């Protein structure tokens, strides 16, 4: 039962990371000034 709980936790964390990556990509496309530094870093991370 504990293994199942860990699996659910990992899936939720991965889903959040994917959603966050999508949000950053959208913001980069919009060329939001605040996100310009994050976008530079984001280009080096292979999403």
Curated annotation (Swiss-Prot):
Location of the protein in the cell: Cell inner membrane
Broad class of where this protein is predominantly found: membrane
Keywords recorded for this protein, A-Z: Cell inner membrane, Cell membrane, Membrane, Transmembrane, Transmembrane helix
Pfam family, one: MgrB
Membrane topology, as annotated: Single-pass membrane protein
Transmembrane segments: 6-26
Residues forming coiled coils: none
A GO BP annotation: negative regulation of phosphorelay signal transduction system
Record's signal peptide: none
InterPro entries registered for this protein in UniProt: MgrB (IPR020907)
GO cellular component: plasma membrane
Protein origin, superkingdom: Bacteria
Binding partners and assembly: May form homooligomers. Probably interacts with the periplasmic domain of PhoQ.
Function: PhoP-regulated transcription is redox-sensitive, being activated when the periplasm becomes more reducing. MgrB acts between DsbA/DsbB and PhoP/PhoQ in this pathway. Represses PhoP/PhoQ signaling, possibly by binding to the periplasmic domain of PhoQ, altering its activity and that of downstream effector PhoP.
Family: Belongs to the MgrB family.
Entries under NCBIfam families matching the protein: PRK10299.1
This protein's name: PhoP/PhoQ regulator MgrB
Source organism of the structure: Escherichia fergusonii (strain ATCC 35469 / DSM 13698 / CCUG 18766 / IAM 14443 / JCM 21226 / LMG 7866 / NBRC 102419 / NCTC 12128 / CDC 0568-73)
